[in-house]
A protein has these predicted regions:
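Glycine- and acidic-residue-biased ligand/ion/polar-headgroup-sensing regions
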Residues: 50-60
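Conserved short histidine dyad/triad with adjacent acidic residue
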Residues: 17, 32-46
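Short acidic-glycine-tyrosine-enriched beta hairpin
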Residues: 67-81
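Ligand-binding loop in jelly-roll beta-barrel domains
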Residues: 81-107
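A short, N-terminal "cap"/entry segment at the start of jelly-roll beta-barrel domains
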Residues: 1-28, 112-136
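A generic "binding-loop/recognition-motif" signal
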Residues: 30, 38, 48-49, 67, ...
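Anionic, Ser/Thr-rich low-complexity intrinsically disordered regions
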Residues: 76, 97-98, 104-112, 122
Length: 136
C-alpha cells in the first residue's frame, strides 16, 4: 500500500456491536477512523497508549478521569496513558471520530492474534449486559 492513500483502502472491522473501525499504522503511532452506529456505550477502560480524539460528526457523552462532558463536531479529547475513560453515543445520528494512539495498539491491527486482557474485558462487559443496563 502506498504511503499516500485514502480510508477506502483500509478494511472496516466491527469490533463490538455498532462500532466500526479502520486503522492506519506506522511504527510508533496509529490513527483510526471510528463510526458509532446505534446506541453505543463504551464502558470505563484504560490502556497504555496515549489517545487523542477528534469528533467529526454526531454527539457523545464522554468521561475522562473525573471530567464528564458532552462533545460534538470539532471537539478534541486528549487522554493520557492509563487514564480511565468512557463514552456513550447521544441521539440517533452516527458518531464519526478519528483517534491517534502512541504507542500503537497491536490489538487494533487486522490479523493480530495476541491477547489483550483489557480489551477482552471491555468486550465481555459490553456483550453480557442488556442495553438498559449499559450505564457508564
Amino acid at each position: 500500500m502506498s504511503q499516500i492513500t485514502t480510508w477506502d483502502e483500509f478494511p472496516t472491522v466491527e469490533y463490538v456491536k455498532g462500532v466500526l473501525r479502520q486503522t492506519a499504522s506506522g511504527e510508533k503511532v496509529m490513527v483510526t477512523r471510528i463510526v458509532y452506529q446505534g446506541s453505543v456505550i463504551i464502558p470505563e477502560h484504560s490502556h497504555e497508549a496515549e489517545q487523542i480524539m477528534l469528533v467529526v460528526s454526531g454527539r457523545l457523552w464522554s468521561k475522562v478521569a473525573d471530567e464528564e462532558k458532552e462533545v460534538g463536531p470539532g471537539s478534541i479529547l486528549v487522554i493520557p496513558s492509563n487514564w480511565v475513560h468512557a463514552f456513550r453515543q447521544l441521539g440517533d445520528e452516527d458518531v464519526v471520530f478519528y483517534e491517534a494512539f502512541a504507542p500503537i495498539r497491536l490489538e487494533y491491527l487486522v490479523g493480530f492474534k495476541g491477547p489483550d486482557p483489557s480489551l477482552a474485558m471491555m468486550h465481555k462487559r459490553f456483550d453480557e449486559t442488556d442495553e438498559s443496563d449499559r450505564k457508564v
